[in-house]
Amino acid sequence: MKEENLCPCDSGKTYVTCCEPYHKQHNAPTAEALMRSRYSAFVFGLVDYLFETTHPNHRAKNLKADIASTCKGLAWTGLDVRDVWQGGEKDKVGKVTFHASFVQEGKNGVHVEHSRFKRFGKAWMYVDGEVKG
């Protein structure tokens, strides 16, 4: 990816100044930053990153295979963060509601999720999400 390319998380920043540092083992400072970096990881098919940023207590047996299947089956086309509750640099928990647009088998769709995040040591981790609609 070229340095000037915008980040797929729709932050308005370039990928190298937005999600790439998190993908290269830097902890996201907030729950929203982690959620955006996970969206970008789905766009790029970064299965290991998505697995590693899922809270250890919430890693299902087939999680890596499920992530890989999702990455291959959907073309993500946009992210709209709708609401953020806590999840700041000094918080221990956070919630982010977002709409993620995608194309699957030539049809447009929107994934609406209310995600929960929790600190694990110094790192924000994805716990789970309530999918709407």
Regions picked out by a protein language model, each given a short descriptive name:
Residues 70-107:
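Surface-exposed, charged secondary-structure patches
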Residues 5, 92, 122-123:
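Beta-strand-connecting loop/turn residues
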Residues 1-37:
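Short, low-complexity N-terminal intrinsically disordered segments enriched in polar/charged residues
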Residues 52-81:
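Short solvent-exposed beta->alpha transition segments
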